[in-house]
A protein has these predicted regions:
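Positively charged n-region of N-terminal signal peptides that target proteins for export
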Residues: 1-4
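Extracellular beta-propeller repeat domains
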Residues: 18-395
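Bacterial N-terminal signal peptides
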Residues: 8-15
Length: 395
């Protein structure tokens, strides 16, 4: 079934207007069954180069009785053909929740949060050339790895985990995945505390500096944005969320680098809280270094709220896109875009339908395949109730 919606411009900086445009089309292209095909995808899909071939993971499901998750492949050039390429086990790790990352050597790297030798998950590699799965590193005293960033030039894989070896507030780690498989080069770079924030959710490497957002705690209890050298030294607080609640609380989604002729910006999103809205913010990295400003505020009943996985940069460099996990007309979330090179206008493009068949509770973000065609995952709903992969085409 295909679903249609008209575009609504909801808010941007100080601009508020409503209008319509030709209809945008959304449809579920895969219904997870809860068994062999997997269940509950909680992360984004990635595209291998510009091939139209996508890979993703499900947290649960698979052909084992313990519902340990799978790696799957979707070929958008062959009528969205779906294939499971790996079934997780107690030995190979289980319950992957972070998005895969693509390496120049035609490998995918990912992480699991449970199972493996010590029960705390692992880092793994799936080779796209020979289809071999290898465990790279098994966590022994760090738990719940939840985001990864690969620097292809150095071969260093960076990541965050909810629990660090010395604290329960989380950590940042790195491992060399280019020169040794399995790797013995694992290193914890930084352990969070109450003041620096807890539960780091995403990180990015820009100009030899790591930027990491944390979901809670910090000076005002609502999360932080932290900057540090790529070796974990010289950690500095960029911003403590909650001081100005209009800027949002609880930053959660991935950080996106946007550059123009004069300035580099990091764009991020906040989930919001009871007395604090979901927002889009940006931080200047060159001119006006580390100055944070509000880009847009979400309205739950119109444009949606809780953009779980943040933004993606579009083929069109002036635009970023994302999905919300709540709100909108049907309270199942929305698909939106924001103008990152102009007035910051925030536009709702699609409401997730109310009938559950499309899928809902979007914890993963989007991938743009071609121009104006987007694929994403929903954690719940669909024909069997275990989530979907959906496609949205905008006009």
């Amino acid at each position: 079934m295909k679903y249609f919606v008209s575009l609504v411009i909801v808010a941007a900086f100080t601009i508020i207007s409503v209008g319509t445009s030709p209809q945008n089309v959304g449809e579920p292209i895969m219904h997870f069954s809860g068994n062999t095909s997997g269940a509950n995808p909680q992360s984004s899909l990635i595209e291998v180069g510009n091939t139209g071939i996508l890979y993703g993971v499900t947290r649960n499901g698979g052909n084992t009785s313990d519902d340990l998750g799978v790696i799957y492949r979707i070929d958008t050039t062959l009528n969205n053909t779906f294939t499971v390429v790996h079934q997780f086990t107690d030995i190979t790790g289980c319950h992957p929740i972070s998005s895969l990352v693509f390496a120049n050597d035609l490998s995918l790297f990912g992480s699991t949060i449970r199972c493996s030798q010590f029960g705390y998950g692992n880092i793994f590699r799936y080779n796209l050339s020979n289809h071999i799965f290898n465990v790279i590193y098994e966590f022994a005293d760090i738990a719940n790895p939840n985001s990864l960033f690969l620097d292809n030039d150095s071969g260093l894989l960076y990541g965050t985990a909810d629990v660090g070896s010395s604290t329960f507030y989380g950590s940042v780690f790195t491992i060399d995945v280019k020169h040794e498989i399995p790797s013995t080069t694992f290193k914890q770079l930084f352990s969070f505390n109450y003041g620096t924030g807890a539960f780091p959710s995403n990180l990015i490497l820009v100009n030899n500096s790591l930027y990491i957002n944390t979901q809670i705690f910090g000076q005002y209890g609502a999360g932080t944005l932290i900057k540090m050298d790529r070796d974990g030294e010289n950690a500095k607080l960029v911003y403590a969320f909650g001081r100005d609640k209009a800027l949002g609380c609880c930053p959660w989604g991935q950080l996106v680098l946007v550059a123009d002729e004069q300035q580099q910006y990091l764009y991020g999103t906040t989930m919001g809280a009871a007395d604090c809205p979901s927002t889009i913010y940006r931080v200047g990295l060159t001119m006006m270094t580390n100055q944070i400003e509000l880009v847009a505020t979400f309205n739950e009943t119109t444009v949606g709220s809780a953009p779980y996985d943040g933004l993606i940069q579009s083929v069109n460099p002036s635009l970023s896109f994302g999905v919300t996990s709540q709100g909108g007309i049907n309270n199942h979330g929305t698909f939106f875009r924001v103008n990152v090179s102009g007035d910051g206008s925030l536009e709702k493009l699609f409401d997730f339908p109310s009938d559950d068949m499309f899928g809902y509770q979007t914890q993963g973000g989007l991938v743009e395949v071609g121009n104006n065609v987007f694929y994403g995952t929903a954690n719940l709903g669909g024909k069997y109730g275990f989530g979907t992969v959906y496609k949205i085409t905008i006009s």
